[in-house]
């Protein structure tokens, strides 16, 4: 899950939101989001975020900038995951989830 906030004149990902990665803690839970985004909870792609942003009156460039920022942060995410208290299997599952979902946002 994710959350946005606007500290000044730009939207940013919240520094902390839903800190429990349910997808690795409970692999039987197949939903990626608790609430729907553009009518979906799973297999979200760029088009779904763009639709939601347009519905909220946000420009496409804001969504694209947020995704670019997430991609830039990926090395830091990997470092944090691997320095965490998680087991090696959980670390791999967590990293795989992050990478897979970011890759999905790049698909057209």
Residue ranges with predicted function:
Residues 1-108:
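Anionic ligand-binding catalytic core segments
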């Amino acid at each position: 899950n994710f959350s946005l906030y606007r500290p000044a004149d730009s939207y940013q990902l919240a520094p902390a939101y839903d800190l429990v990665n349910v997808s690795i803690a409970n692999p039987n839970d197949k939903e990626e989001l608790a609430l729907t985004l553009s009518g979906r909870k799973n297999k979200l792609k760029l088009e779904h975020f763009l639709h939601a942003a347009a519905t909220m009156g946000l420009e496409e460039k804001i969504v694209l900038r947020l995704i670019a920022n997430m991609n830039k942060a990926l090395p830091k995410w990997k470092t944090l995951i691997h320095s965490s208290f998680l087991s090696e299997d959980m670390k791999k599952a967590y990293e795989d989830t992050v990478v897979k979902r970011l890759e999905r946002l790049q698909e057209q």
